Amino acid sequence: MENNSEKKIVCLINPLAANKRWKRRRKLRAELVKTLPGSCLDTPRTKEETVEMTRSICPSADLVVAVGGDGTIADVLQGIFESGRQDRVVFGVIPFGSGNAFRKSLGIPRNPFKAIKYILEGDIFTIDLLQIEDRVAAFASVGSTAAVTGEKLRHSIPGLFGHLLAARKLLFYKRTENILELSGAVDQEGRQYDQLTINSSFLDCVIGNSNYFGYSWLVAPQARLDDGFLDIILFEMPPLIYIFLFPFIYFGWMQRKLRHFKAKEVVIRGQGLEVQYNGEYLGSMDRVHIKVIPAAIRITGNRKKADRFLVNRADRADSRSKV
């Protein structure tokens, strides 16, 4: 974008993010109002209202900024796509939630005051997203991590402590036989398939375009933000072994030894599959449909730090543009 003063920037702030710390962080609001030309709006309490607010402001916005965690990001992205303006609006992220996984793949610092710099001066580059049923997201999972997300939601336990407490559900998670139907698939040996069917009694199936998950967990080290594929990782082990290996899983070391696929689209069939996207619980279902949205949206970030998660590393023409 040529000139900040000539462009309409809208910040959508989740005041309930990060255990309502927003109420104690008036300084951040003052900095946003001072630094970013345009509007700073608090999002409503419900997801549906946040999506609707985003949809309503998109026709007059050039840059839409989500201030919150991964759930807020998912809601704002949903609103942008429902407005039909995803090819015209630039998306920005200022992390201020319990889970801020998405920002890490983009090279955006966790400190919200430092993140403001990348809204104004950051690189602009194009990334893929995924569509899970009728929702837009950067990552999703089917199985035990989704069950933990649902448990946390049911008991309204905030923050990291809530995740750790809800994680006890992992110990009792029962694996069942599931079928994955992949379209436009590539296996870990590089073999390509128009259609590929996989049987798996996975504990967890992670599907993503971005690399991080939850609390800076490098769950998908081989995913690329702009390769036009979903990254699919199968954790096919009992819960106790998963917990024992979790330090290696957290840093992405174990994933290269697991079954791993890329695909344009996947349908997962099973009984009572628990599903989450961007840390939001979608529910329990017997069939889940996920597909990649290639070149989905332009986003502001730190291209230098994000480079290892990008395919188009040599092409800087797009990223040289400043907001």
Write out the residue ranges for each language-model feature.
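ATP/NTP phosphate-donor binding region
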Residues: 1-67, 74, 79, 306, ...
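Short acidic/glycine-rich loop or secondary-structure boundary segments that cap or lie
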Residues: 146-148, 189-191, 212-216, 240-243
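Glycine-rich phosphate/pyrophosphate-binding beta-alpha loops
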Residues: 141, 145, 206-219, 281
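Short glycine-/acidic-enriched loop or helix-start segments at secondary-structure transitions
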Residues: 22, 75-77, 103-105, 149, ...
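Short helix-capping segments at alpha-helix termini
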Residues: 34-35, 83-87, 277
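Catalytic core of DAGKc-family lipid kinases
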Residues: 10-13, 20-21, 83-204
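Short glycine-rich anion-binding loops that position phosphate/pyrophosphate groups of nucleotides
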Residues: 69-72, 96-99, 142-145, 210-211, ...
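ATP/nucleoside-binding phosphotransfer catalytic cores, i.e., glycine-rich phosphate-binding loops
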Residues: 193, 199, 224-230, 234-323
